[in-house]
Amino acid sequence: MAKIGNIEHVEERVESELMPPSMYKVVLNNDDYTPMDFVIEVLQVFFRKNEQEATDIMLTIHHQGKGICGIFPFGIAETKVIQVNQFARQNQHPLLCSLEKA
């Protein structure tokens, strides 16, 4: 405690530990109508996957019903979901992108 004039100044140190942000998986879900080439394009454009990575994820989506495009903090994941869903609708595809807690 320090005294400045007639005022006592109390200095308290509070140590806080920053917690890492909650992470979310961005998932593409399979449907019977969206062309495989369009899914690959989405993976390359929105998730920066190379052709081989995009093809592998697309095949996982096709065979297992869904595939993980990436894991991001909530704000980024939410933005990517919105962008992908808007892009799919603009191109008349029912492709669905969603979030899952990692």
Curated annotation (Swiss-Prot):
InterPro entries registered for this protein in UniProt: ClpS, ClpS_core, Ribosomal_bL12_C/ClpS-like
Signal peptide: none
Record SUPFAM superfamilies: ClpS-like
GO biological process: protein catabolic process; proteolysis
Pfam family, one: ClpS
Subunit (UniProt): Binds to the N-terminal domain of the chaperone ClpA.
NCBIfam families recorded: PRK00033.1-3 (NF000670), PRK00033.1-5 (NF000672)
Family: Belongs to the ClpS family.
Function in brief: Involved in the modulation of the specificity of the ClpAP-mediated ATP-dependent protein degradation.
Record protein name field: ATP-dependent Clp protease adapter protein ClpS
Gene name linked to the record: clpS
